């Protein structure tokens, strides 16, 4: 049983170009995420899945310099990229992580993997938590079925909708999140320049590789002027696709 974390990352985001390579202190966003993921007790391997586009050579070079496995695939059909990366690296269970969420909860990753394995679920995630902390866990078999059957553009771009939209075909489970993560009004994903500015403020006060999420939440509650930097950023629906 091999459990792999796959980080989807590219430089061509429309709202914030090169975002995963932007520096927070002496490390870029993707590097901070990679370092944090090393704390997981469940992941056997971590792979960065980027695109075949020339502009993403920089991501490949970074991964090579860090000794991190990398896979290149379709830019728009991210489901195909995940399927082929999982197949290439022989993953039985896959954790989907996005490269613009450097503070992805390691606690939740490990709990989700545990629940999936103990209960023979096909898919496990966590709803209603601070944006930027979540991940998804699913079996290779579920991924393969989605890869074969998903037809809609958004299902191909966002990887997992075909799975969780079909609970009659898959055993889908959502963990109850810890109370401290059930918060509205805090946004910790990096999608826009405002999101990045908030992280620049956090970086002044914390070691982002080792900080506990509770410290971040407490800090933002005590500093609403920082918390509100990105409060008016619109979060896109998973059914929206980039043309």
Swiss-Prot record:
UniProt xrefs under Pfam families: CTP_transf_3 (PF02348)
UniProt source species: Methanocaldococcus jannaschii (strain ATCC 43067 / DSM 2661 / JAL-1 / JCM 10045 / NBRC 100440) (Methanococcus jannaschii)
Task: Please report the name of this protein according to its UniProt entry.
Answer: Uncharacterized protein MJ1063
Record field: transmembrane: none
Kindly give the InterPro entries that the UniProt entry links to this protein.
Cytidylyl_trans, Nucleotide-diphossugar_trans
GO cellular component terms given for this protein: cytosol
Query: From what superkingdom does this record's organism come?
Result: Archaea
